[in-house]
Amino acid sequence: MPPTVDMGIPGASSSVAVNPTRKRVLLAEPRGYCAGVDRAVETVERALEKHGPPVYVRHEIVHNRHVVSTLEKAGAVFVEETDEVPEGAIVVFSAHGVAPTVHAAAAERNLHTIDATCPLVTKVHNEARRFARNDYDILLIGHEGHEEVVGTAGEAPDHVQLVDGVAAVDNVRVRDEDKVVWLSQTTLSVDETMEIVERLRQRFPKLQDPPSDDICYATQNRQVAVKAMAPECDLVIVVGSRNSSNSVRLVEVALGGGAGAAHLVDWADDIDPAWLEGVTTVGVTSGASVPEVLVQGVLERLAECGFDVVQPVTTAQETLVFALPREIRSAR
């Protein structure tokens, strides 16, 4: 067994090849499915088992093309809005969460709803409602148009201002500088979010933090693993779809952490052989909505190109499991 060595970041270790010139893959651990994604995907699968197709799903259940395609083949029908769902039918809300207006629209059509919102997103929704009840200005750090941001803002539309990047800080206006709090989208870059928070705090010294971290444990863990291996990587390949915020952030983290290059791929066929020219060490990770089968496909493709040594870079162990929505627990 190759030796285990310190990777230079607390808690990170890797089995590193004795010959540093041999082509190798550093494989980030943890990677792939988080507890919220696992719960959401299983929710649709169990709903199909219990009720039979079609089961309607508002928006992509998670941001991954492979997952959506697989569920479509099983009988899931993905729609943009609830008015596309036949009255009285079953509809699943995606892991990203929805605004109260969506619940109301579903009720008007007598839809049978199953809410697959990630519990960590629900936590942010609850925070938004609580601070709005106390008449705070809520500065929501996130990406404009992202489903999660739309849902969270919809919980308190009269109190929430979106802060999309450091440049947006200068445009923020509040009513009372003593009653300002920041919340965030759960899938952001930790470093970028903290940069925005510090800039906000320069403007509003009494800015309050959320009661607990809004950026989810899985997002943070995957970014830490990428940071651990990035300095040793000529190239980092992130498996994930382009509309997946947390996957895109992993590319940014890899580049910021010292990787020579970083690319986002949906699957192995997206790998450009030119990326591998002159490369000795390739880092591989995947976003929180990516099934492991897609990572294995990438590893097989890299092995065909001579990268047949795979060494883990482990920074955390994940054991969290979320209970399924009560509407479909009996289907287990």
UniProtKB/Swiss-Prot annotation:
Cofactor: [4Fe-4S] cluster
GO biological process terms held by the UniProt record: dimethylallyl diphosphate biosynthetic process; isopentenyl diphosphate biosynthetic process, methylerythritol 4-phosphate pathway; terpenoid biosynthetic process
InterPro entries: LytB/IspH (IPR003451)
Gene3D superfamilies: 3.40.50.11270, 4-hydroxy-3-methylbut-2-enyl diphosphate reductase, catalytic domain
Domain of life: Bacteria
CDD domains: lytB_ispH
Residue numbers binding dimethylallyl diphosphate: H63, H96, H146, S244, S245, N246, S289
Binding site for (2E)-4-hydroxy-3-methylbut-2-enyl diphosphate: H63, H96, H146, T186, S244, S245, N246, S289
Pfam families: LYTB (PF02401)
Residues binding [4Fe-4S] cluster, per UniProt: C34, C118, C216
Single GO MF descriptor: 4-hydroxy-3-methylbut-2-enyl diphosphate reductase activity
Pathway: Isoprenoid biosynthesis; dimethylallyl diphosphate biosynthesis; dimethylallyl diphosphate from (2E)-4-hydroxy-3-methylbutenyl diphosphate: step 1/1; Isoprenoid biosynthesis; isopentenyl diphosphate biosynthesis via DXP pathway; isopentenyl diphosphate from 1-deoxy-D-xylulose 5-phosphate: step 6/6
Enzyme Commission number: 1.17.7.4
Cofactor note: Binds 1 [4Fe-4S] cluster per subunit.
Binding, isopentenyl diphosphate: H63, H96, H146, S244, S245, N246, S289
Assigned keywords, A-Z: 4Fe-4S, Iron, Iron-sulfur, Isoprene biosynthesis, Metal-binding, Oxidoreductase
Catalytic activity annotation: isopentenyl diphosphate + 2 oxidized [2Fe-2S]-[ferredoxin] + H2O = (2E)-4-hydroxy-3-methylbut-2-enyl diphosphate + 2 reduced [2Fe-2S]-[ferredoxin] + 2 H(+); dimethylallyl diphosphate + 2 oxidized [2Fe-2S]-[ferredoxin] + H2O = (2E)-4-hydroxy-3-methylbut-2-enyl diphosphate + 2 reduced [2Fe-2S]-[ferredoxin] + 2 H(+)
Stated family: Belongs to the IspH family.
Purpose of the protein: Catalyzes the conversion of 1-hydroxy-2-methyl-2-(E)-butenyl 4-diphosphate (HMBPP) into a mixture of isopentenyl diphosphate (IPP) and dimethylallyl diphosphate (DMAPP). Acts in the terminal step of the DOXP/MEP pathway for isoprenoid precursor biosynthesis.
Protein name as catalogued: 4-hydroxy-3-methylbut-2-enyl diphosphate reductase
Species of the source: Mycolicibacterium paratuberculosis (strain ATCC BAA-968 / K-10) (Mycobacterium paratuberculosis)
